[in-house]
Design a protein with these regions (language model features):
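Elongated, mostly alpha-helical coiled-coil "stalk/stator" tethers of large membrane protein machines
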Residues: 1-122
Length: 122
C-alpha cells in the first residue's frame, strides 16, 4: 500500500507544482473530499462498487465538485483514483500528499517542549 499511496501522492504533487496551483488550497480541497467520503458510507459504496460503471461514479464526483467548488485538477485526480480502482486509498494518499507537499516546500514537523507554559504572544 505504501508504494500506491506515495506514487499517487507524488504524481498529484507534480500536478500542483507544474500547474502552479496553491498547495495549501489544493491540500485543503483534497482533505475535504477525503473527509466527505469518510463520512458517507453510501458514497464509498458507490465509488467502490465494481458493478457501477465508472461514468456514473465520475458523474457523482462531478456533482460533488460542482456543489463544493473544488478545482478541476482535484476533480481529475479523484477521477483517476476511481478509474484505477484506488479510491479506497484516498485518505492515506491525501496524508502522503500532505507530506510530499511539505517536503517540496521545505517544511518539517517539529515538536516543541517548554519548561513552562507559554503565553499567546510567545
Amino acid at each position: 500500500m505504501a508504494s500506491v499511496t506515495s506514487t499517487y501522492a507524488r504524481a498529484f504533487a507534480d500536478v500542483v507544482f507544474d500547474q502552479r496551483l496553491d498547495p495549501a488550497k489544493t491540500l485543503q480541497e483534497a482533505q475535504s473530499v477525503a473527509q466527505l467520503a469518510a463520512g458517507s458510507r453510501e458514497l464509498w459504496e458507490v465509488w467502490e462498487a465494481p458493478s457501477i460503471p465508472a461514468e456514473q461514479k465520475r458523474a457523482l464526483l462531478d456533482a460533488i465538485v460542482g456543489r463544493a467548488g473544488f478545482s478541476k485538477p482535484l476533480r481529475n485526480f479523484v477521477a483517476v483514483l476511481i478509474d484505477h480502482r484506488r479510491i479506497k486509498f484516498l485518505e492515506p494518499i491525501v496524508k502522503e500528499f500532505e507530506h510530499e507537499l511539505n517536503r517540496r516546500l521545505g517544511f518539517v514537523e517539529a515538536q516543541i517542549i517548554s519548561a513552562r507554559e507559554l503565553g499567546a504572544p510567545e
